[in-house]
Amino acid sequence: MKQLTETQQLKELIAQYRSEGRTIGFVPTMGFLHEGHLTLVEKASKENDIVVMSIFVNPTQFGPGEDYEAYPRDLKRDARLAEQAGADVLFTPSPSDMYKGEQNVAVQVKRRTDVLCGASRVGHFDGVATVLTKFFNLVKPTRAYFGLKDAQQAAVVDGLIEDFFMDIELVAVDTVREEDGLAKSSRNVYLTEQERKEAPMIYKALQQGAELIRDGERNPETVIKTVTDIIENTSGVIDYAELYAYPELTPLKTLNGKVILACAVQFSKARLIDNIIIDIDEWERS
């Protein structure tokens, strides 16, 4: 596995790969890798000639009160895991390399960001879209891989690729979970022992909501109340529990088509997100 830190190094290597006609799979991350990230690398490795993983804790997507400096980092461990999973190139640029002085241009996301996590993290997805535009221009991937645990991010990336006519296939991969259903996340390390026991209730609540929809419930408020009633039995504080059309993330008075049931729960030192995406039309046909 090649490890690169400078954008010029990466540009030269990508130019070589493209001249050889190789397909490139790209897995962007902020590091502190877990099985969810590695699943993306493994899938990318099966579907492309070359896999590029980036590790970059992006300062522009951290909002007020979010501690950029405290985000967990362990590059030596991450490099070992990335190589074992099948990454061919690990790109770990510095903030000064990705953001050279004052920016002339930044991406502003107009839709899909005023709900779910975006509602309380103003500017977050602008930072995500800006850095991904930079990465996409550097890596020039055939396919880009994102986990559906952050389904709002995947929806924003879908819009970014579509609106800017990027010749990139977005591959959205199902959430990887612990045996008890908790979505794997770098933030799980911040849970206390008691909170770790309670956290799987988030996914259980979403499953109950999805089951209601499967059984014919089409009122969003009824489904959401079922979810919140279950989560309120934990010590976590619900940030949101919401239902929208997916990937448009627009509200629905009556549930139909593809929808996302999503929630965020704040524990003492960890804010956990999770979701279930439900294709109602597909369920009704089966």
UniProtKB/Swiss-Prot annotation:
Keywords: ATP-binding, Cytoplasm, Ligase, Nucleotide-binding, Pantothenate biosynthesis. Its EC number is 6.3.2.1. The active site is at 37 (proton donor). One of its GO terms (molecular function) is pantoate-beta-alanine ligase activity. InterPro entries: Cyt_trans-like, Pantoate_ligase, Pantoate_ligase_C, Rossmann-like_a/b/a_fold. This is Pantothenate synthetase. GO terms for biological process: pantothenate biosynthetic process. PANTHER family: CYTIDYLATE KINASE/PANTOATE-BETA-ALANINE LIGASE, PANTOATE--BETA-ALANINE LIGASE. Catalyzes the condensation of pantoate with beta-alanine in an ATP-dependent reaction via a pantoyl-adenylate intermediate. It catalyses: (R)-pantoate + beta-alanine + ATP = (R)-pantothenate + AMP + diphosphate + H(+). ATP binds at residues 30-37, 147-150, 176, 184-187. It is found in: Cytoplasm.
